[in-house]
């Protein structure tokens, strides 16, 4: 029987977090509807592993109080009782409550953009921008060598336009890390 046939039509966040999801895999709650997430492809998985490793090594080397987590649950500020998103990586500099399903106070959120999840990913990114603690969002592309770095301005606003970075390196100012694109994309299969 398909998992689509066994999922409830609508759920609250509380019901979703208590729900025993059918089968393996990760689920998000989008506007009250549980949605199964597709397994990551090879390039997606490789890019996620590399960026998480680079960030973790940097945070440890600088004795930072911040922590990187892969696939953390995040409750957006808007319609919080009906949504639960799972970004690829997030960094928090706040204490982590291991009993909580959701990461509170993320400072940096990273999404890996595949052609098949473009609309969903950008919807989530717009929701992350409404979380007061989020200072920076990194979007990593799998169809080509490209990243977008979105940074909250000093006045709390986000940029209207993003300049794609397709060569050289980029800096995650929220944690003080410079990442060469060649290092990030090495062995990813993305050209």
Q: Where are the regions that the model predicts?
A:
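Gly/Pro/Ser/Thr-rich low-complexity, intrinsically disordered segments predominantly at protein N-termini
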Residues: 1-191
